[in-house]
Every structure is written in structure tokens, then in C-alpha cells.
């Protein structure tokens, strides 16, 4: 199981060229053998944006009368195949929370051009993406009409994993070792930043373009020495397979890299025209994730029921890990801290990694979360 990689689907330049209807769904992977700072409430200009031709008029308004008892139909698009990032969604579905809220939710796989493209077009109302992957969607003359409305996981759990004892428990140790790169500007800039902050020389890291879909096999076979993983899946996969590893998290080296990954994104017109339905959906979804926090084993069973092809041992272990990560130290599940959100985009702006500056407070809202 893995997340859809921005690195695999489109380069940043190609994404910026998609003026019509989309951007790649995500960057980074939960791949595998097995994949608060001060609160500042900021009004999101993206959510206030008027309807554009990109939306295609797909999102229905609440002003359109429904027959008595008819449920509001919503489409939720995943970023990749079902995994523990999505557990709360499946829990809410299985336990009838959406139905109780008057909603009929269809969960679908992403198209080739990604989840955000489908949400921006209005063909899906909600989906999964990542803050770093959303940057190209926002850094353009005509930003895609989507808004991040919840953080699935409160802190960035990604980092570099390697075989234990080979000196890569800190970034400088990546010197003279093979790193499997997606060859993306943001990715390489982040690696360079942490290596150099640790006193190393990024030019000495051996970059081999490769998309690793099985960390355990890649590390055991010594195809590569270091891999970017999201620990909830790739890291846990090495534990489940009894492979000793070293690991460092990006956020522990540079706090600006504690950005939000993944997030729930929503169509702006749907948020504007169907505010009550959007809030009802987010309230039901929050209940699903809260249940996953309280009962990780039960939540894992629900996910495995929905996606029986998954490795149940890995799912159970990943769920146990994520019970402490979904909300972590936030005041409630889903809350997005403005300082951290803006901090990462500010870093992209300062390092010329966005084609157009992303303004502070842009692209997210906590307005639709239950209070």
C-alpha cells in the first residue's frame, strides 16, 4: 500500500501547467512491504473564492430543495488505496455516523491526475492531500478552488529510515550513502537543509532516482541505504518484519518541517453553498477518528473489513502507533495550527520553491471542524 506520489505522477512544473482542473494528489509515500504552537485563527481567502469555471458547477447548493428524508450525497476521494491514514473515514462509515448526519458518502479511488484534481472539479466534495503537495495548487495565478479543512495527523511523522548501525541515525550520516530520491526540488531542498544543519555536505549524498514501494525488501537487499518514509506505515513495516533500523524525523531537525501531512481537502464552492452539510460531514468524520484513537484495535478491524487485501498485522501495529498521532497535543482532532501551516509555506517562499508566493493564512480553515 502506498500514497500516490507527486514524484511519480507529475513534476512541480507540470503541475503548475494544469490550469484546467488539477494537481497531483500527494507527495511522499507511506510505502511498504507490507504505507501546538500558538493558535491563530485566520480567514482563508481560498474558501471565500467565488465559483470558477474549474468547479464545473458540480457542487450542489443547500438551497436546492431535497425531498423529505433524502440524504445529501457526497463523494470522498482517497489519495491512494485504503490505509491507516483513512481509518477514521471507514469507522464513520461503518458505525453509521454519516447516515446519522443525513449524508450518503461514497468513497472512491483517485483518478490518475490525483485526488485534489477531482475535488477542485467539483466531482468530489472531499478528499485527501498533503500540505507540501498542495503548494503547486495554491502558488499559481488561478489557485485551485480547494481548502484544507482538517489535519488527519497532527504532526509530520516522515523522516529517513536506514539499516541499523550504518551511521544514518542523524542526517550527516547520509554522506557517502545511497538515498532513493523522487528527484523533486522540495524533497531535495529539505534533505539538503537537514544534512547541512547537522554539519554535513549534501553534495556527498548519493542520489539515486527510485520510487521504493517495499522498504523492507529494499533495505534488506541493500538496493539503497536510506529511504524517506512515513513512519506510521513504512517504519512500522520494518518493525513488523523484525528489521532493525535507524530513523530520524525531519521535524526533529528543523521545526519548519512539522507541516501537515496528510490533510482533508474540500471543494470551495461546496463549502460556501453547503456549509451545514460540510460541517455535518466533518463532525461525523471527527467522531470516526476519535473512535480510532480510543479503540485502535477495533478501528483496525473495521479498516481490514473494508480493505481485506491489507496485512492485518501491519494495520493493527500501524493503528496502535497512530492512536497517539492523530490528535497528539492539539486541542481536538483535525485542528490546523496557523503558525505551522504558514511556517512551511514561508520556507517554500523564501527558498524560491513556489512559483508564486503563497500568502500567510491561505489554503486552510478550521471553520468546519466541530467546536
Descriptions of predicted regions:
Residues 273-350:
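Secondary-structure end/capping motifs
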Residues 2-26:
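Sec-dependent N-terminal signal peptides of Gram-positive bacterial secreted proteins and lipoproteins
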Residues 35, 44, 55-201, 206-211, ...:
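Short, glycine-/small- and polar/acidic-enriched structural segments
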Residues 146-148, 207, 292, 299-303, ...:
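Surface-exposed patches in mature extracellular/periplasmic domains of secreted proteins
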Residues 18-42, 47:
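Bacterial lipoprotein signal-peptidase II cleavage site
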Residues 341-371:
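Conserved C-terminal helix/tail region of periplasmic/extracytoplasmic solute-binding proteins
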Residues 214-217, 222-307:
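Pocket-lining segment of extracytoplasmic ligand-binding domains
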Residues 202-206, 307-320, 355-362:
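Short, surface-exposed acidic
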Amino acid at each position: 500500500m502506498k500514497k500516490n506520489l507527486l514524484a511519480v505522477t507529475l513534476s512541480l512544473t507540470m503541475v503548475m501547467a494544469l490550469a484546467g482542473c488539477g494537481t497531483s494528489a500527494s507527495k511522499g509515500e507511506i510505502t511498504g512491504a507490507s504505507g501546538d504552537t500558538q493558535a491563530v485563527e485566520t480567514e482563508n481567502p481560498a474558501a471565500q473564492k467565488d465559483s470558477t469555471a474549474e468547479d464545473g458547477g458540480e457542487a450542489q447548493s443547500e438551497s436546492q430543495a431535497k425531498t423529505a428524508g433524502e440524504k445529501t450525497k457526497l463523494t470522498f476521494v482517497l489519495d491512494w488505496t485504503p490505509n491507516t491514514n483513512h481509518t477514521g473515514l471507514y469507522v464513520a462509515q461503518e458505525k453509521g455516523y454519516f447516515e446519522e448526519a443525513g449524508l450518503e458518502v461514497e468513497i472512491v479511488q483517485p483518478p490518475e491526475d490525483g485526488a485534489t484534481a477531482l475535488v477542485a472539479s467539483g466531482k468530489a466534495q472531499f478528499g485527501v492531500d498533503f500540505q507540501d503537495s498542495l503548494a503547486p495548487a495554491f502558488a499559481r495565478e488561478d489557485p485551485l478552488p480547494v481548502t484544507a479543512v482538517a489535519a488527519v495527523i497532527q504532526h509530520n511523522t516522515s523522516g529517513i529510515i536506514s539499516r541499523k548501525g550504518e551511521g544514518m541515525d542523524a542526517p550527516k550520516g547520509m554522506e557517502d550513502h545511497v538515498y532513493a530520491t523522487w528527484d523533486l526540488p522540495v524533497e531535495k531542498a529539505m534533505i539538503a537543509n537537514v544534512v547541512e544543519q547537522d554539519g554535513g555536505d549534501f553534495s556527498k549524498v548519493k542520489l539515486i532516482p527510485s520510487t521504493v514501494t517495499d522498504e523492507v525488501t529494499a533495505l534488506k537487499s541493500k538496493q539503497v541505504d536510506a529511504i524517506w518514509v512515513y513512519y506510521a506505515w513504512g517504519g512500522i513495516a520494518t518493525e513488523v518484519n523484525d528489521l532493525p533500523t535507524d530513523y530520524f524525523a525531519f521535524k526533529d531537525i528543523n521545526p519548519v518541517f512539522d507541516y501537515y501531512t496528510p490533510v482533508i481537502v474540500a471543494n470551495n464552492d461546496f463549502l460556501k453553498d453547503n456549509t451545514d452539510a460540510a460541517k455535518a460531514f466533518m463532525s461525523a468524520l471527527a467522531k470516526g477518528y476519535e473512535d480510532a484513537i480510543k479503540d485502535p484495535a477495533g478501528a483496525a478491524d473495521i479498516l481490514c473489513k473494508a480493505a481485506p487485501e491489507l496485512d492485518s498485522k501491519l494495520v493493527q501495529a500501524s493503528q496502535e502507533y497512530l492512536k497517539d498521532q492523530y490528535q497528539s497535543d492539539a486541542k481536538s482532532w483535525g485542528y490546523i495550527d496557523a503558525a505551522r501551516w504558514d511556517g512551511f509555506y514561508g520556507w517554500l517562499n523564501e527558498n524560491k520553491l513556489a512559483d508564486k508566493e503563497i500568502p500567510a493564512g491561505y489554503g486552510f480553515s478550521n471553520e468546519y471542524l466541530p467546536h
